[in-house]
Amino acid sequence: MGSLTIQIGRHMVRLWIIAVYVFLAAPRGEAQPIPSSGGDGLFRELGCVSCHTDLGGDMPIREQAPDLSQAGLRYRTSYLLEFLQKPGRVRRHIGRARMPDFHLSEKEALALALFLEQQKEAPGNWPQLPGELRQMLDAPAAAVSRADFDRTLASGLACLTCHALNGQGGMIGPELADVGYQLHPGWIKSYLVAPALFGVPTNVMPAQFYRLSLDGEKFEPIFPQSERAIATVAGYLSDAGAERRAALDQKLAAARRTHPQGSAGLGEQLFRSLNCAACHRHVSIKPREHAAPPLASEGLRARKPWLEHFLRNPTALRRAGYHPGDGSRMPDFRLAVDEARMLADDLMSRRTSLPGLKTNVTLLPLSVFSRDKAIHLLQEKFSCLGCHRLGNVGGVVGPDLGGVSSRLQPDYVFSIISNPRQLVPHSIMPQIPMPAESIELIARCLVMGGWSNGPATYLSPIDLPMAATLDEIDSRSRTARVNYLRHCAACHGTEGRGDGFNASFLLPAKPTAFTDRGYVSQRPDDTLFDGIHSGARVLNRSPLMPAWGTSFSGEEIRQLVQHLRAFCQCQAPPWSGDGSGQRP
């Protein structure tokens, strides 16, 4: 637990400070009133628009979820480790907002907890504190008997009107028996002094012990010895969670031993990858603008039965994240059946026109011969499986193709193969040159081929070096470095070593290591240009390397060539020039 020394008048005062809100969560299927605004209202109440920003509108979750700039001052690290792996319901007065489950591993949860442990941003100055209150805040929590606690409550406090204690009392606020293992003792005392200073409206948590003077300059006790009452309440609640606290501390110690490489730095990478700042305010980390797919045209893209099932049981469509390698995930909100149905109805009603969408596409039946021919084209000629997985073959850059038949409408499948950049302008998927009959054949194979989904687990952001370059990836600038990171690094690695996260899924094919001076220095710039423009197939290498000629201008490809040469710190061979000493 940390403290903060601040200037109040002529005095330096040490305060234990924290923001008010606790993590929010609700168990799957628990009945709650459905918002009158229907699926759109539920969509916003859950905070979906925080990541799916194309829908815009109000984001009430930003005011309901805790400001994590001060998480290290309020939450015990051992509690965070458990909660991040198994988020449970804490508060009940905020409608259907909840903390979703990101299905974090222990290694991931530890790193994120260690990052949050360090977040101790100090808020502004407090009003003047009475001397006895300063002493109480500085004093360690003392053991308090249940009898003393009950007498203090009976003196006029209304805690159990909203809160329960061991299941007895109100059902609006957090269970008081849990705060001793969840929160630092110093924060409990500071919060009880003045909930309103932590952003809690008085109609949610009214002042029980102190009120602000009319001029807002100092605290005034509501009844004699208010500071002693706070010490009694905080002491009892802190002690009540001692047994659970000890057990959680043991789990934290064991996790540290199991994952000695866990660090706050990796936790920050997770925090950014998962876009935690989209719902949780943070003083220095801002929400990502492009962390999830646009949904304004979902009714033209998805099939409703699949969508409804996916909302209740989200799986990894893009195992490395929405943008390949960013580590983002679709979290599990543990939706009830009626919630998933309402959201699916709302999303299917969103039919903003898609440029390039070919409608009323008719796909002929798929014979065994046609299926085998399509598979041959996918594996031996076209580069689709360099990014997508089908069965047990292919990369993990794009969505798994196994579930296309149940997930996507045929019109969309045909159109995305025909011209992906027209349909989804910011997609990195290139337009692969292929005859119309091949487009139709592959669309039939995917829609009618009877494929099953592949592995449905996410790759960890901790193991994705590209997750450390989110600011550059999200910028969508067109510099050579950003173009390389967005389009090439998944296979060739962020530093050009041929060790991108997708490389192991392409074996026996191996991406070129541009750090190999002996290899790259023997290739003219024209050769590298051709490989980028037309794909590795024109260089008699793996067809899994796509042709990027429709994605980049000629000048952008030339800049990429020079970016690749920077990895090996080598130039084109002298014989490839024009004799002038200048590069061609």
What are these regions (language model features)?
Residues 27-44, 120-154, 241-272, 351-379, ...:
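Electrostatic cytochrome c docking/interface patches
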Residues 14-25:
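Bacterial N-terminal signal peptides
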Residues 32-33, 50, 56-121, 166-242, ...:
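Extracytoplasmic electron-transfer domains, predominantly the class I c-type cytochrome c fold
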Residues 47, 158, 275, 383, ...:
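The −1 position to Zn-ligating cysteines in a subset of zinc-ribbon hairpins
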Residues 448-476, 489-515:
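Accessory recognition modules or surfaces
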Residues 53, 164, 281, 389, ...:
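Short Cys/His-rich local motifs and their 1-3 flanking residues in nucleic-acid-associated proteins
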Residues 50, 161, 278, 386, ...:
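Short, cysteine/histidine-rich loop/knuckle motifs that typically chelate Zn2+
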Residues 1-13:
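N-terminal secretory signal peptides that target proteins for export/translocation
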